Amino acid sequence: RRRYWDVAEAPIRLLIGKSTPLGLYPTFISPRTGAWTTAKVTMGALSDSFYEYLVKQWLLTGRREPYLRQMFDEAMLAMARHMVQRSSPSGFVYVADYMGHGQLAHKMDHLACFAGAMLAVGAQDGGSYDAEYMTLADAIGETCYEMYRRT
């Protein structure tokens, strides 16, 4: 039904064309003004589902809403460029929190482990970034496996 689509789509429509720091979506936005209220970007708590649902919503619409895929791709490329880190000396790949102004919090919330599966879902389209997404998905999955195995 169109009525439900319009209600569910309203928050996404608000974000289309909105200026985002480095192509990433901060954790909080004002419901009154639509302005970002923090510079923090995370793949962990309070943000994990947003990124996941971009690609899932695109798939659920039969891939007929290209802006959803575009938002997903832009965010994933920005995440890879600005948030993905490698630990030393173990060499595990993790997704740090972006705190704004080029600053990272070098930790990975366990909820960010979903990012591996999310990237794998996003790589099933024959798109331009499939190989990059799968490589990163595998690395994040390995990190999360080891994180749980070792604790």
Predicted regions located by residue number:
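Glycan-recognition and catalytic cores of secretory/periplasmic carbohydrate-active enzymes
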Residues: 1-151
